[in-house]
Amino acid sequence: PIAGSMVLAAILLKLGGYGIIRMMQVLPTTKTDMFLPFIVLALWGAILANLTCLQQTDLKSLIAYSSISHMGLVVAAIIIQTPWSLSGAMALMIAHGFTSSALFCLANTTYERTHTRILILTRGFHNILPMTTTWWLLTNLMNIATPPTLNFTSELLIMSSLFNWCPTTIILLGLSMLITASYSLHMFLSTQMGPTLLDNQTEPTHSREHLLMALHIIPLVMISMKPELII
C-alpha cells in the first residue's frame, strides 16, 4: 500500500535519526576523534545504497534505497555534533521526508495507470500526462538538492561541517552526490521520456493527485525561503 510507503519514508525512517541525535548527547564529546571511522562508514553506506539504486529496475525499490542513502548523510552529520551539522541533519530529514513521500506518490500514480513498476515499461509519460512529468521533474530536482530547495541548504550545511571536520571526507561525499544525481536523472528519463511501450488507454490525472503533489512541494519551497524556522 502506497500510504504505508509514504509514512515509512517520510516519518518512521526519520525517527531513527532523531533517536541518534538524542543518544549522541549522552556520549562524551571528548572522545570525538574516535568517531571518524563511523563517519566514513556512514558515507560509505550512502555510496553503496546509491550504487544499488543505479542497478534497480523496480521503481519503488529505487526510491526506497534512495531514502537509505540520504540517511547515511544524516548519520554522518549527527556524529560530528557541531551546530551546523545538527542543523543540516535536521533540515535534510525534513526535506527528504517531503521529497521521498512525493516520489512514492508519483510512483503510485504511474503504477495505477500502467500496472507495472518496471522502469522500462513505464516510459513515454511526457506525451500522455505532461503535468505528471512536470511533477516528476520538480521532485527529482529536489532529490538531487538543486537550489533554492531546502535539500540544497541542508546538504550544503552537512558538506561544510564534514569538510571542516575532515577534508578527505569530501571525496566520499562528492561521490555520493554524483551518484545521486545520476540515478535521479536515470529514473526521470526512464519513466517519462521515449516512446510509450504499453498500448492501454491511460486514465487522465485527477485533481486530488495534483493537490497531493502540491501539498508536498509547496511547503518544502516555503520552508526553503525561511529556513530559520527549522534550522
Swiss-Prot record:
Catalyzed reaction equations: a ubiquinone + NADH + 5 H(+)(in) = a ubiquinol + NAD(+) + 4 H(+)(out)
Pfam families xref list: Proton_antipo_M
GO cellular component term of the entry, any: mitochondrial membrane
One MF annotation (Gene Ontology) recorded for this entry: NADH dehydrogenase (ubiquinone) activity
Residue stretches spanning the membrane: 1-21, 34-54, 62-84, 89-111, 118-138, 169-189
Swiss-Prot/TrEMBL keywords: Electron transport, Membrane, Mitochondrion, NAD, Respiratory chain, Translocase, Transmembrane, Transmembrane helix, Transport, Ubiquinone
Top enzyme class: translocase
UniProt key word Translocase: yes
UniProt membrane topology term: Multi-pass membrane protein
EC number(s) given by UniProt: 7.1.1.2
Compartment(s) of residence: Mitochondrion membrane
Main location: mitochondrion
InterPro entries hit by this protein: NADH_UbQ_OxRdtase, ND/Mrp_TM
Gene Ontology process terms (BP): ATP synthesis coupled electron transport; electron transport coupled proton transport
PANTHER family linked: NADH-UBIQUINONE OXIDOREDUCTASE CHAIN 4 (PTHR43507:SF20)
Family statement: Belongs to the complex I subunit 4 family.
Role played: Core subunit of the mitochondrial membrane respiratory chain NADH dehydrogenase (Complex I) that is believed to belong to the minimal assembly required for catalysis. Complex I functions in the transfer of electrons from NADH to the respiratory chain. The immediate electron acceptor for the enzyme is believed to be ubiquinone.
Protein name: NADH-ubiquinone oxidoreductase chain 4
Native source species: Protobothrops elegans (Elegant pitviper)
Gene: MT-ND4
